[in-house]
């Protein structure tokens, strides 16, 4: 199901000799979303990447879920936008989440066109680095 995990950037503090000085712990609040709801949301967000506006976030051999966003900044009519894409992979067992936010992109300004390719490039490098195996399945079955 869904667990709330505190975002964090480190798990240990090391001294100059590389020995652990402190191990950080982060609270996990369990059961905030049912397993069924979590699976449904993963499926919907995976479809955004496989068939929708997030297609530029697809990574060959990996299942990726995500959401694009495009917003106009004030004042309205200024022609200024914020484009973004948040993605997670592998979609069936998320290990990595990343977001790209582009403030006032030039030319094309849609999140799926501007920000999703950034996450794709990141995942093309980081997923193999993490030792995650490619899959033949590109999309999970509907629940």
Segments from the language model and where they lie:
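Active-site beta-strand/loop architecture of penicillin-binding DD-peptidases
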Residues: 1-29, 36, 45-131
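Short, highly charged C-terminal tails/helix-capping segments
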Residues: 133-143
